[in-house]
């Protein structure tokens, strides 16, 4: 009997020990990032926008960058370019395949091809390259030469081949840094020195030497303009394009993307953004839908005193494939990390600020074209599979006003583009 009791106790102890070991051992099944990004079926139309870049200057004049785009890929030798050629099939081009997109004849034909591709890909609108302020003039001359490119896209430049948008809309992106580059924590928009501007005033007055006749007189007026008024005037000029029938609206509101929104240092962000909205509303009768661009992998709370307190309508992330310098750990479970990042940002924006989230999707990222020897940034080679996965991550994190922004159509400097290439050359698609 005693032997039986010992045997029973031994078996019980062994069972407990085995069970305890099984419970204590970690399982990969329990790991919070152990999941796959599944294909997301959509049940409604999701508006899709795409960023249009204007990188032609570097690609036309920088032979090294063009070589790094077109040369054969050799990972062992550190040659990480896409081995492709941007492709327009334009007979006017001086060199086949050379990139060109500007307000001229070749640029207009290239723009028409881009629109055809956007239409084929069912892209709803293009976000045009960021518009800079012209600090030397006042409204309506305060955005300078950017008007030539915008008018070309709109098909309103009579000196160029007419561009037809064919149902593809456009939206504008403002470059906040062009007005706020000198601002910081100790130099706010409210206390920075006003800008001295001289502008012409044209008047018609009686000609004292010829009774009954008039003469036109131009007078130069010297004035001081507060920085906050400059910013409002800049948005007023941007809003002149809202009446274009091809300008993209959501819910009846014109969409404006704000690049470098974190450069607007102000004592009261809400008051500053309210002044901007009031200026545009008074000028156009429209309420803007403002989308602030946030840097990839940055925490939302960092921008509390900027556009979040300013109550923009939505926030979007820049290219998440740009994982940052030496951030190699983000590459290992990249898809899951992006998804968790989006989930967190979306929840914070909505629950704390009542601001919507607009996910972005990118096909890849590489520093190689822009800076050949910069190995500090992990290489995220552009692939169709990555782009599909990022689109599914975006669909998993749609906001209350569903929309997705693709970064980008043609940012060749960082090989993060979906623009078609010459299919007969290298790894063309």
Where are the regions that the model predicts?
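N-terminal secretory signal peptides that target proteins for export/translocation
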Residues: 1-3
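Sec-dependent N-terminal signal peptides
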Residues: 6-15
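C-terminal motif of bacterial Sec signal peptides marking the signal peptidase cleavage site
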Residues: 17-20
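Glycan-processing catalytic domains of CAZymes
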Residues: 25-429
């Amino acid at each position: 009997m005693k032997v039986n009791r010992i045997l029973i106790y031994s078996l019980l102890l062994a069972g407990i020990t085995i069970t305890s070991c099984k419970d204590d051992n970690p399982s990969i099944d329990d790991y919070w990032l152990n999941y796959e990004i599944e294909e997301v079926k959509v049940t409604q139309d999701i508006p899709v926008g795409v960023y249009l870049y204007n990188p032609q200057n570097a690609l036309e004049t920088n032979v090294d960058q063009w070589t790094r785009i077109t040369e054969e890929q050799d990972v062992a030798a550190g040659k990480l370019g896409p081995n492709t050629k941007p492709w327009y099939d334009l007979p006017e081009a001086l060199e086949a395949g050379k990139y060109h997109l500007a307000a001229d004849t070749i640029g207009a034909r290239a723009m028409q091809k881009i629109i055809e591709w956007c239409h084929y890909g069912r892209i709803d609108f293009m976000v045009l390259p960021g518009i800079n302020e012209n600090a030397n003039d006042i409204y309506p001359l305060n955005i300078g030469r950017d008007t030539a490119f915008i008018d070309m896209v709109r098909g309103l430049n009579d000196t160029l081949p007419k561009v037809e948008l064919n149902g593809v809309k456009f939206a504008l992106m403002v470059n906040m840094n062009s007005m706020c580059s000198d601002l910081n924590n100790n130099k706010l928009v409210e206390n920075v020195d006003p800008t001295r501007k001289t502008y012409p005033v044209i008047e018609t007055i009686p000609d004292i030497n010829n009774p009954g006749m008039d003469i036109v007189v131009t007078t130069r007026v010297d004035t001081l303009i507060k920085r906050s008024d400059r910013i409002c005037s800049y948005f007023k000029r941007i809003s002149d394009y809202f009446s274009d029938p091809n300008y993209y609206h959501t819910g009846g509101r014109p969409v404006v993307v704000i690049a470098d929104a974190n450069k607007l240092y102000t004592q009261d962000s809400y008051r500053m953004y309210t002044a901007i909205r009031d200026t545009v509303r008074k000028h156009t009768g429209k309420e803007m839908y403002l989308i602030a661009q946030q840097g990839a992998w940055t925490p939302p709370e960092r921008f509390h005193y900027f556009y979040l307190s300013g109550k923009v309508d939505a926030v979007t992330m820049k290219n998440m494939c740009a994982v940052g310098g030496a951030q190699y750990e983000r590459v290992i479970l990249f898809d899951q990390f992006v998804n968790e990042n989006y989930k967190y940002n979306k929840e914070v924006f909505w629950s704390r600020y009542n601001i919507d989230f607009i996910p972005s999707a990118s096909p890849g990222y590489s520093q190689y074209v822009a800076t050949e020897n910069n190995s500090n940034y992990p290489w995220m080679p552009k692939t169709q599979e990555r782009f599909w996965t990022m689109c599914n991550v975006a669909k998993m994190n749609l906001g209350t006003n569903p929309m997705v922004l693709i970064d980008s159509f043609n940012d060749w400097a960082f090989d993060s583009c979906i623009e078609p290439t010459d299919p007969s050359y290298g790894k063309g698609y």
